[in-house]
């Protein structure tokens, strides 16, 4: 673990953005998530780590109701964002996903121009009143994704023609274009080379100035580099949650220590 650069920052005073209480998830008869209780702070990067199949991605998808799209999946318990129960029947999942953006494992740009990839969400949600406002929103989103300088002269080119790392940053720009408050990232660097990974990791650190960022990662080194809080999942349970530096250097639960040191996983 000596090769890890542990980022430890004071986030204790930050407000709670997301709260989960007694959350359980079932896929048919399979009990995938078991009584998860956690509070995720605002403008903080929170990493979910754990072995494959531990439930970290399943729980991540609960935070913007992506599991609603799976017929056999049912979610129990209570999840709130800014105190609002996101599973309340009055909540529109489409509007929720504008507020809680998501970036997936593999870059998935739409088969549209770079401009139209970013403009898609604002058009759907009516966030721009005219072309000038939309142009400004697209530019600001690409700037936030650290991509503007690379694409500003070819906004009409296909998004699929960009490199893998650029495509993932385009997907991040597309996510922030709907003016979300939370960004969920499910293994966002797993398909990228080391240089592109470093660019996205630097971007994640910048994004937390404006958003709550929750990232699922199999890389403990990545979790240590980018996050201030870390949650360790194992067999559907949230085993331990705390400051990233503490989780990696002085965990309380033996299962966490076993995972960090490579004895389980």
Curated annotation (Swiss-Prot):
Its EC number is 7.3.2.1. InterPro entries: AAA+_ATPase (IPR003593), ABC_transporter-like_ATP-bd (IPR003439), ABC_transporter-like_CS (IPR017871), P-loop_NTPase (IPR027417), PstB-like (IPR005670). It is a peripheral membrane protein. It holds the Pfam family ABC_tran. One of its GO terms (molecular function) is ATP hydrolysis activity. It comes from the Bacteria. Residues 18-260 form the ABC transporter domain. It is found in: Cell inner membrane. ATP binds at residues 50-57. Gene3D superfamilies: P-loop containing nucleotide triphosphate hydrolases. It catalyses: phosphate(out) + ATP + H2O = ADP + 2 phosphate(in) + H(+). One of its GO terms (biological process) is phosphate ion transmembrane transport. SMART domains: AAA. Keywords: ATP-binding, Cell inner membrane, Cell membrane, Membrane, Nucleotide-binding, Phosphate transport, Translocase, Transport. GO terms for cellular component: plasma membrane. PANTHER family: ABC TRANSPORTER I FAMILY MEMBER 17. The complex is composed of two ATP-binding proteins (PstB), two transmembrane proteins (PstC and PstA) and a solute-binding protein (PstS). Part of the ABC transporter complex PstSACB involved in phosphate import. Responsible for energy coupling to the transport system. Belongs to the ABC transporter superfamily. Phosphate importer (TC 3.A.1.7) family. NCBIfam families: 3a0107s01c2. This is Phosphate import ATP-binding protein PstB.
């Amino acid at each position: 673990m000596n090769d890890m650069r542990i980022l430890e920052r004071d986030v204790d005073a930050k407000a709670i953005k997301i709260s989960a209480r007694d959350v359980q998830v079932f896929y048919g008869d399979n009990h995938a998530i078991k009584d998860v209780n956690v509070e995720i702070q605002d403008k903080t990067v929170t990493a979910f780590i754990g072995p494959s199949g531990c439930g970290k991605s399943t729980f991540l998808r609960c935070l913007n109701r992506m599991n609603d799209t799976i017929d056999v999946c049912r979610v129990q318990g209570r999840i709130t964002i800014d105190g609002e129960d996101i599973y309340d029947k009055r909540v529109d999942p489409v509007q929720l996903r504008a507020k809680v953006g998501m970036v997936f494992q593999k870059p998935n740009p739409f088969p549209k121009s770079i401009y139209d990839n970013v403009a898609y969400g604002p058009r759907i949600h009516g966030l721009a009143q005219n072309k000038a406002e939309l142009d400004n929103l697209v530019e600001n989103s690409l700037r936030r994704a650290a991509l503007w300088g690379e694409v500003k002269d070819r906004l009409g080119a296909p998004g699929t023609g960009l490199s893998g790392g650029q495509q993932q940053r385009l997907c991040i720009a597309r996510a922030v274009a709907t003016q979300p408050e939370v960004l969920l990232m499910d293994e966002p660097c797993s398909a990228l080379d080391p240089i592109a990974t470093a660019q996205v990791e630097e971007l994640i650190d910048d994004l937390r100035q404006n958003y709550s960022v929750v990232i699922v990662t199999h890389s403990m080194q990545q979790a240590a580099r980018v996050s201030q809080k870390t949650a360790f999942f194992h067999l559907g349970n949230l085993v331990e949650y705390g400051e990233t530096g503490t989780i990696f250097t002085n965990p309380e639960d033996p299962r966490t220590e076993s995972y960090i040191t490579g004895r389980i996983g």
